């Protein structure tokens, strides 16, 4: 049900005041444009998504001289707009500043809030899908439309050849899990929930009369504990789940059953499980889950919380690289994240003169802690960060960036968790005044392996990464006796991720395509390269369903990229105006990044 919050701000008696209304027929807000000037916010407009398609909003106010600030919301990754803080000044007769908050991060303050009155647009448990308000010379007032947040449903892993069951998703949390295991696998599962603040006893799904071993797991509601993922093991021959490994946000893992069979994962970007569904009869044949969003797990800033705030957000899978600029103290820090399979590098926040890198072996390695030193406060109670050191899940420690001067130590760490996003403050001197982080439990090891690239000499290295679910489509461009260009489209979190161009597309006379079905995956790549040109001259792909045509020149291979019982989920290599080398990332059959 849609809920409308009335517009707040300045009520004007001017005849020229214009009221506007974008309506509530949207799925999400995707981008916000705010245009400000010396006298406040002059105009604002919003982009939406409706029925899965983009919809541009109208400009409200005067789009004339001034500056425009934007804030994008990645609805494809489950991000949505939760609330708005706005500031108005009756003396200057208009809105002066505005700030937006999603379920993952907070925008910078757009405008100036000095000596202003603040109001907030927010409804607990709901998201914003539309705006309305009024304007004259400035934006005068703002209101919003809200709707309840729908849970994410992950389909069952396993077989569907028995009785279907569904506990639903109208719960606040899981309370207790009970599993009966036997020699043939999991015989039944029973889950109790918290609904409307009260305990709801679940039903038995499977066969409760058999012999076996009973295992139980309780979720500690008083400590705000919740399930973040389930790792399961499924036997194709018996069509029965053999084991279930449950993981909570407090890093309390419980294994029920056996680690036998094909591995699968039920997870949704750090969200919490609020319900299960599946198929069962004489045993548990499959399992799926419902997820709801959670409040970000946030480690507060250490240091001086004065200056300009910045917030990378927490909607990332992990950190791939750290950049630190330092001559004596820490002048700047920024990060390269994995955002749903795409590399996202945070922007420069100041000029850098001595930037150094710390590279992680992601997705097999995560940042687990940051140790820092703060300068001794001055007479004006001012401090800043002197040094930073990063530690990883593989036991590695980065070099210490910054100054070796003594100061107050601090640590950003949550036991058993990975740091997946950062926030902080920049001081008037544009050095780092404070640093905080977002964390989530370290995901199960994906067992990603990197098979070295094969081919000739030359070219610059590239790497699409290996955290995708599968390959969707391949483009191959052929030049003069050589493969001149390749490009890969991948599946990640049920959406298509477009890889970068590798090689020279414009020099390729023929552009060929190889399209895979949604349940098809690549198991090997064979090819040929020419020692004289250093370029690859032929490629052929084999999937679990078919072999592709020969792309290029010739049919005799001199290299093969393959690992038994694994599937290819990403590519790397070298290229210039042609493709010189090609390598792959592989994961065990049955494992998927969710």
UniProtKB/Swiss-Prot annotation:
CDD domains: Jacalin (cd09612). The keyword Repeat applies. Residues 1-23 are annotated as: Disordered. GO terms for molecular function: carbohydrate binding. InterPro entries: Jacalin-like_lectin_dom (IPR001229), Jacalin-like_lectin_dom_plant (IPR033734), Jacalin-like_lectin_dom_sf (IPR036404). Residues 2-148, 151-293, 296-441, 448-588 form the Jacalin-type lectin domain. It comes from the Eukaryota. Belongs to the jacalin lectin family. This is Jacalin-related lectin 44. It comes from Arabidopsis thaliana. The lineage of its organism: Eukaryota, Viridiplantae, Streptophyta, Embryophyta, Tracheophyta.
């Amino acid at each position: 049900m849609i809920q409308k919050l009335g517009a707040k701000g300045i009520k004007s008696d001017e005849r020229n005041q214009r009221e506007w209304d974008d309506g509530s027929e949207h799925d999400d807000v995707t981008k916000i444009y705010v245009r400000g000037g010396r006298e406040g916010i002059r105009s604002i407009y919003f982009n939406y998504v409706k029925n899965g398609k983009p919809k541009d909003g109208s400009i409200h106010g005067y789009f004339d001289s001034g500056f425009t600030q934007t804030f994008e919301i990645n609805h494809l990754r489950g991000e949505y707009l939760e609330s708005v803080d706005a500031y108005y000044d009756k003396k200057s007769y208009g809105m002066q500043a505005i700030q937006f908050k999603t379920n993952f991060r907070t925008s910078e303050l757009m405008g100036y809030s000095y000596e202003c009155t603040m109001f907030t647009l927010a409804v607990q448990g709901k998201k914003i899908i539309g705006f309305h308000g009024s304007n004259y010379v400035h934006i005068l007032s703002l209101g919003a439309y809200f709707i309840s947040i729908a849970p994410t449903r992950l389909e069952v892993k396993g077989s569907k050849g028995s009785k279907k069951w569904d506990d639903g998703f109208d719960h606040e949390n899981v309370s207790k899990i009970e599993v009966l295991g036997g020699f043939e696998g999991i015989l039944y599962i029973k889950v109790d929930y918290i609904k409307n603040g009260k305990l709801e006893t679940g039903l038995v799904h499977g066969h409760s009369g058999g012999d076996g071993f009973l295992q139980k797991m309780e979720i500690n509601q008083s400590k705000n504990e919740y399930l973040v993922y389930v790792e399961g093991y499924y036997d194709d021959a018996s069509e029965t789940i053999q084991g279930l490994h449950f993981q909570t946000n407090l890093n309390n893992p419980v294994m029920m059953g056996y680690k036998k069979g094909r591995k699968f994962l039920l997870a949704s970007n750090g969200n919490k499980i609020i319900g299960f569904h599946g198929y069962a009869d004489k045993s548990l044949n499959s399992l799926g889950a419902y997820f709801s969003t959670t409040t970000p797990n946030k480690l507060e800033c250490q240091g001086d919380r004065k200056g300009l705030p910045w917030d990378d957000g927490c909607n990332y899978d992990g950190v791939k690289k750290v950049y630190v600029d330092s001559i004596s103290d820490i002048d700047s820090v920024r990060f390269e994240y994995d955002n749903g399979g795409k590399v996202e590098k945070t922007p420069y926040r100041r000029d850098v003169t001595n930037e150094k890198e710390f590279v992680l072996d992601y997705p097999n390695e995560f940042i687990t802690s940051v140790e820092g030193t703060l300068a001794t406060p001055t007479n004006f109670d001012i401090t800043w960060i002197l040094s930073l050191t990063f530690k990883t899940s593989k036991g590695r420690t980065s070099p210490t960036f910054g100054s070796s001067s003594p100061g107050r130590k601090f640590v950003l760490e949550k036991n058993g968790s990975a740091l997946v996003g950062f926030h902080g403050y920049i001081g008037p001197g544009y050095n780092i005044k404070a640093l905080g982080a977002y964390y989530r439990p370290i995901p199960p090891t994906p067992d990603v392996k990197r098979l070295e690239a094969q081919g000739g000499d030359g070219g610059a290295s590239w790497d699409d990464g290996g955290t995708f679910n599968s390959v969707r489509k391949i483009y191959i461009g052929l030049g003069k006796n050589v493969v001149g260009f390749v490009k890969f489209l991948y599946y990640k979190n049920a959406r298509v991720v477009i890889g970068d161009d590798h090689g020279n597309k414009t020099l390729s006379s023929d552009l060929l395509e190889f399209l895979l079905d949604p349940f098809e995956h690549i198991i090997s790549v064979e090819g040929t390269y020419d020692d004289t040109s250093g370029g690859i001259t032929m490629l052929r792909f084999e999937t679990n369903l078919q072999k592709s045509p020969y792309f290029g020149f010739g049919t005799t291979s001199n290299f093969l990229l393959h690992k038994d019982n694994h599937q290819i989920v990403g590519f790397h290599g070298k290229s210039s105006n042609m493709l010189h080398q090609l390598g792959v990332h592989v994961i065990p059959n049955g494992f998927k990044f969710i």
